[in-house]
Amino acid sequence: MNLEVIAQPIVLGLIVASGPLVIVSLAARRGNL
């Protein structure tokens, strides 16, 4: 098993999961929540 084949889905998953978290954290810092 190639590491690239395993790493690509993990990286994509982290990017998709971190997207909303970054937006929420930025909104929390601005006091919009």
From Swiss-Prot:
Transmembrane segments: 5-25
Membrane topology of the entry: Single-pass membrane protein
Pfam entry (one): PSII_Ycf12
GO CC terms, sorted: photosystem II; plastid membrane; thylakoid membrane
Function, as annotated: A core subunit of photosystem II (PSII), probably helps stabilize the reaction center.
Protein family according to the UniProt entry: Belongs to the Psb30/Ycf12 family.
The name this protein goes by in its record: Photosystem II reaction center protein Psb30
Organism: Aneura mirabilis
Gene designation per UniProt: psb30
